[in-house]
Design a protein with these regions (language model features):
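Non-catalytic alpha-helical scaffolds and adjoining flexible linkers that form interface surfaces
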Residues: 1-151
Length: 151
């Protein structure tokens, strides 16, 4: 899936780097998949707002992901109207950092880190939820990557 008239070179680089990353024994296939999916969303201009609270603009204590609102909330706004703890869920500071890193990093440096099991679980949840709420098409290259992950 790409927007019409969009330069697809970065997406092709992402696919290439992702396929190369699948050969690296120290990188889990699950992590490669989630990085690929989330970066693809970002390259298509559809990434959630992750660098400041979507309610107040605060840039610290960003611990609550709100898939419906396509962004992250600080601790204070999570507990206030209109959110009151609804629709958002807690993620660790490490997960927030990883999501920001995926969005902001150049494609060639995406696969230079690993994550803990806890961060991987949160990353799975965030990416799956975001896809369900905001992405209405199936990525053909994501399907190809899925097929490769089965082996």
């Amino acid at each position: 899936m790409t927007m019409e008239n969009m330069d697809t070179r970065e997406i092709l680089k992402l696919l290439y780097q992702s396929l190369r990353a699948l050969k690296v024994p120290s990188l889990s296939r699950e992590l490669v998949r989630r990085i690929y999916e989330f970066k693809l969303i970002a390259l298509n201009g559809e990434a959630p707002r992750l660098f400041a609270c979507i309610a107040c603009g605060r840039k610290d204590e960003l611990f609550y992901f709100h898939p419906q609102k396509a962004g992250i909330l600080c601790e204070a706004c999570y507990e206030k109207e209109p959110y009151n703890g609804r629709g958002a869920y807690h993620i660790s500071g490490s997960t927030t950092y990883i999501l920001q890193r995926i969005v902001a990093s150049p494609v060639k440096t995406l696969y230079t880190f690993s994550v803990s099991e806890h961060v991987m679980q949160e990353l799975n949840l965030v990416v799956k939820d975001y896809f369900e709420k905001h992405i209405d098409k199936k990525f053909q290259s994501a399907q190809m990557l899925d097929d490769l992950l089965l082996f």
